[in-house]
């Protein structure tokens, strides 16, 4: 048993990434996830409860739902246990975040981009290559060219990450190392490399 919270519980994950007072942690992680694409400077947490569109349909409660300062809507989920049809569930979640953007009256169908970031403490598809990250976009099947940038899913399969602390070469890998081992750590690694990891430690000490 380590000093820090277990991020694979609903409470632990939302405490880590879902609090307004510590939203810099989520901003930092998202920037390290999307490094080289664009820089997020702020996020606004949105209502994570999505009501059904028609009576008798199922509603959705996201773990974390936010909008960036550049307009992307981002769903962040932690799934601890293996679940059948998880790919379909992820598609359903993003689809609802898209259809909820529809406006009454005159509307030109312009959409905000919707990203889904799915942490999984299991292997999603044993027939696929054992990679830590699977990045899904809408692209042309023949050319591979991006067709529409309004839909993106990033699946992070934690069991496929096997690097030791001194083998982590990027800040994204450092985040994944910390998340995978957090509830067994006695100290927060990588503090000398990036200030956000010290902030992360200070945030978690308050509940340890």
Residue map of PLM features:
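Elongated, amphipathic alpha-helical interaction scaffolds
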Residues: 1-208
């Amino acid at each position: 048993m380590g000093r820090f919270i277990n991020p694979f519980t609903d409470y632990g994950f939302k405490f880590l990434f879902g609090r307004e007072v510590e939203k810099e942690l989520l901003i930092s992680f998202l920037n390290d996830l999307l490094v080289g694409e664009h820089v997020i400077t702020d996020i606004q947490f949105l209502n994570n409860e999505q009501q059904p569109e028609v009576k008798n349909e199922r509603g959705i409660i996201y773990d974390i739902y936010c909008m960036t300062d550049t307009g992307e809507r981002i769903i962040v989920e932690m799934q601890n246990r293996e679940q059948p049809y998880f790919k379909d569930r992820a598609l359903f979640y993003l689809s609802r975040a898209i259809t909820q953007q529809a406006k009454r009256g005159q509307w030109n169908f312009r959409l905000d981009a919707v990203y889904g970031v799915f942490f999984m403490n299991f292997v999603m598809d044993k027939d696929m290559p054992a990679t830590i990250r699977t990045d899904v976009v809408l692209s042309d099947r023949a050319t591979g060219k991006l067709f529409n940038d309004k839909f993106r899913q990033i699946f992070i399969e934690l069991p496929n990450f096997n690097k030791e602390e001194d083998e982590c070469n990027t800040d994204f890998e450092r985040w994944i190392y910390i998340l995978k081992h957090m509830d067994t750590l006695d100290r927060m690694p990588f503090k000398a490399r990036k200030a956000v990891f010290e902030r992360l430690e200070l945030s978690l000490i308050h509940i340890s």
